[in-house]
């Protein structure tokens, strides 16, 4: 499982700003009013191909035990108890407070690895600030100004050193021959019912009450001579609808499962169409770059007219992922399961396909000759060569000149061309564009004294004419 880092501290110390800086997003609402982050935000910090970890932005811990503030406090404590590393955030401008002392007291009871992070260090005397917080007894204190991105590189370096290679949760699977499939979707869409139908026995608790599955549950399966690990995840729902502390933390488990799976099966309810919650789940799968199969559940309960309407709606709402196969199923009655597994196999094989440098360069050459990049302000981007850079998803690095000016429409053309040429079905395709460095960029051509004299003689000759 991905390691988990929790940001914990009293209200308005800058946890959400740090979260946005680490995850390179604006997902956490940032405001000067204390207590703006009432729920937990979850994101993935991707430093490079090998270093990923989950970040949890908790609401500020307040003194109240009742009402919204009390619920926020319980959420923060739940996040801290599950974390592989806690970043205890304090405010350099306000200094230490009685509430900081109380938070530190229960953090020590948790016995989780904890790092003191002093935020808003800009405009303060850093030595004085460090002296004030020295009484907390941390062997090392990190100072940052998240709003100005000051000290973040040192923070990331320290976090990576302190995190385990794998999170404290159960490892999903390391068997390369076993396909890891995560069934994801909003609550009560039929994920547990589908897994139970595949297994042929009721291993998951399935009911009509949304949110019955509170954690991600993994079950091994052998079917038609192939091995699988099926992961039934808790449903991802709108934050305003997530009320219980236990259920809130299940979102972390779901995101970890998506990051660790090889193929994500997104389940939709044919009777309700594609909702905003479905789009949120789909976004999490796309952010992780996982192979995708869309399972349209409860298809058997639709009339012919309703099916036509549903097909039109699906083509409109899912038009931005035309590469993902969609399968019509009934989790309750088991129809469509064989085609679902075939789609999973195609997506898995495409996502993990290997390529030679020669074949991808031939593809780039044909794509370039068939449809060269358009001229932008009198200049044309040139694609020199390409090489494969990884799988799940298939990734290609394209080298050339003026690639920063390459239009998004042309990048989509390359993606579609490679997808069609190599028959890549059910998987995202990633392109990374790199320009060669110009050794003379930013340098001014300084003339020698002899060149200056020659230039003067030439100018006199021109003027004389």
From Swiss-Prot:
Q: Which InterPro entries match?
A: G_ENGA, GTP-bd, GTPase_Der, KH_dom-like, KH_dom-like_a/b, P-loop_NTPase, Small_GTP-bd
- GO molecular function of the protein, one example? GTP binding
Q: Which CDD domains match?
A: EngA1, EngA2
Q: Which superkingdom, per the lineage?
A: Bacteria
Name a biological process GO annotation: ribosome biogenesis
One Pfam family from the record:
MMR_HSR1
Key words, A-Z = GTP-binding, Nucleotide-binding, Repeat, Ribosome biogenesis
- The EngA-type G domain covers 3-167, 179-352
Q: Which residues bind GTP 1?
A: 9-16, 57-61, 119-122
Keyword Nucleotide-binding on entry:
yes
Q: Which residues of this UniProt protein bind GTP 2? A: 185-192, 232-236, 297-300
Question: Which ranges carry the KH-like domain?
Answer: 353-437
This protein's assembly is summarised as: Associates with the 50S ribosomal subunit.
Into which family does the record put it? Belongs to the TRAFAC class TrmE-Era-EngA-EngB-Septin-like GTPase superfamily. EngA (Der) GTPase family.
Job description of the protein: GTPase that plays an essential role in the late steps of ribosome biogenesis.
Q: Know the name of this protein?
A: GTPase Der
